[in-house]
A protein has these predicted regions:
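Ribokinase/PfkB-type carbohydrate-kinase core domain
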Residues: 2-18, 24-104
Length: 104
């Protein structure tokens, strides 16, 4: 049985300052009646457009474990939303999520 509430995986960063990233995507998509399941790619002190000496905590090493857990739970998503990727390897994690976690 499918979840009656649309569910998406949101693969994106979390910026501490600035109206960007998961801080914006989660409330907007939630107001649209969508269950947002974040897979954070990085935590930044600010967004990267206006600021240059921001801090960045790359979460690439965590993404595989997140996906392993989601797959063990049998989670499926109606869509995958992606944003800022902190490393090229994160594209592989996004592709894996699309391949293995999209609802049939």
């Amino acid at each position: 049985m499918r979840n009656p509430v649309p569910r998406i995986a949101a693969i994106h960063d979390m910026s501490g300052f600035g109206r960007t990233s998961l801080t914006v995507a989660i409330p907007i998509l939630s107001c649209m009646g969508i269950q947002v399941c974040p897979m954070p790619t990085a935590v930044l002190s600010t967004h990267t457009v206006e600021f240059t000496d921001y801090t960045l905590c790359d979460l690439t090493p965590e993404l595989g474990g997140i996906l392993d857990h989601w797959e063990r739970l049998g989670l499926h998503f109606d869509g995958v939303y992606s944003g800022f990727m902190a490393s090229p390897e994160q594209m592989d994690s996004a592709a894996r999520c699309i391949r293995n976690c999209l609802a049939p």
